Regions:
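Conserved "HGTGT" condensation-loop signature of ketosynthase/thiolase-family condensing enzymes
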Residues: 1-207, 221-222, 226-227, 236-374
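Structured nucleic-acid-interacting core domains from mobile-element enzymes and related host factors
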Residues: 209-215
């Protein structure tokens, strides 16, 4: 499902009073009062016509007009109050949607030696392996050496980070939990990792009220001896922390990870509308739009949305495909793509929009910013 933002309807007020019509009604009632005082009451002077014809007609008109005008004023006040509350609610949801996680360390091992830099050049130079699952560039590895490399690179990005390291989350496809990887992680960081098969623990960090310490998220999409090689080998590691804690500890933030928006089946257009309205992303200034998953369907959906919503896509390469270089996505495509986007944002100093859509038309949208909003 998409973000649980309520659809608040517009409140309609009563139509504005047509004063010219009420003046016509007043003249008609005054005329009727005069005629009735002359014919029915047989008034013979102006005072009787005024007292028994004009004055009652005017008072009746005044009562009716006052009642209608009061209802109109109440309706207008109710609409103003409704609009103010609606705007306040929208502002609160925008703040909720724009919450970020600070990334202070990011490591990516992929089939390409240069990582995301290979995908950022001219299109003719971008590696093309859309149907092939490839091994890591350094295919001769073991978990101990990988964890040692991750630790070394994270230490270079944020010296002495281990003093603030609080937890380690391991994201791995269901049925692929490996004791050897957990043992290697424990030996490297002296922390028992928590293992998950989804990004749920990452999602929960956005709404955490605690100023937690550093969290290391390691995502493993590697080949075992007996597993089918359906997706390329990619391994990532990220140091995640709340923006408040990052500012408090003067951490070197390299990117901001905005709240991830799940996609609803068949609701791509409405999801994009909600995303751009609440996430703070300026669609016209986005230079890097990345797609993964069902790329053909996603490309068609984006083109249709752009044509119908006056979205000027980047001229040179309006879309960048992760799968074009790294092949069919695996179960961990989303968290691995987030690490790729952080690396891309760090290399380009530009925001990155990730659109991940599965053949079932589920998936996620996420904006990765090259700096924090605050």
């Amino acid at each position: 499902m998409a973000w649980p933002i309520p659809d608040i309807p517009e409140k309609q007020s009563l139509p504005r009073l047509k004063l010219w019509l009420w003046m016509v009604v007043l003249l008609f009632m005054l005329s009727a009062g005069v005629l009735s005082s002359l014919w029915m009451l047989k008034a013979t002077d102006y005072i009787n016509v005024l007292l028994y014809g004009v004055l009652p007609a005017f008072l009746i008109w005044l009562c009716v007009f006052g009642t209608v005008f009061n209802r109109y004023e109440q309706s207008t006040a109710a609409k103003l109050s409704w609009d103010a509350e609606k705007e306040q609610t929208k502002t609160e949801w925008q703040h909720w949607s724009r919450r970020q996680l600070a990334v202070v360390g990011n490591v990516l091992f992929s089939p390409e030696e240069k990582g995301m830099e290979a995908l950022l050049g001219d299109f003719k130079d971008v590696p093309a392996y859309p149907k092939k699952a490839r091994s890591l560039f350094d295919s001769l590895h073991n978990y101990s050496s990988l964890m040692s490399k991750i630790d070394l690179q994270l230490e270079q990005q944020y010296p002495h980070y281990r003093y603030l390291l609080n937890s380690i989350y391991v994201l791995q496809a269901s049925g692929r939990f490996d004791k050897k990887s957990n043992e290697a992680i424990f030996q490297q960081w002296d922390l028992v990792p928590e293992t998950f098969n989804s990004i749920e623990p990452l999602q929960s960090l956005y709404d955490s009220n605690d100023k937690y310490g550093l969290i290391l998220i390691i995502c493993l999409q590697d080949w075992s001896l007996f597993s089918p090689k359906q997706a390329s080998e990619i391994i990532s590691a990220q140091l995640i922390v709340s923006p408040d804690y990052a500012h408090q500890q003067a951490m070197p933030v390299i990117a901001g990870l905005n709240r991830i928006m799940p996609l609803e089946p068949g609701g791509f257009t409405s999801d994009l509308n909600m995303f751009f309205e609440y996430s703070g992303a300026d669609k016209d200034s986005l230079e890097y739009i990345w797609i993964s998953g069902n790329t053909e369907k996603t490309t068609t959906d984006i083109m249709q949305y752009a044509n119908g919503n006056q979205w000027s896509l980047p001229e040179n390469r309006f879309l960048h495909s992760i799968d074009f270089s790294f092949g069919p996505p695996g179960e961990m495509a989303l968290p691995l793509s987030l690490a790729m986007m952080v690396e891309a944002a760090n290399k380009t100093d530009r925001d990155q929009l990730l659109i991940y859509q599965t053949p079932q038309q589920t998936g996620a949208l996420c904006l990765i910013t090259w700096e924090l909003y605050i």
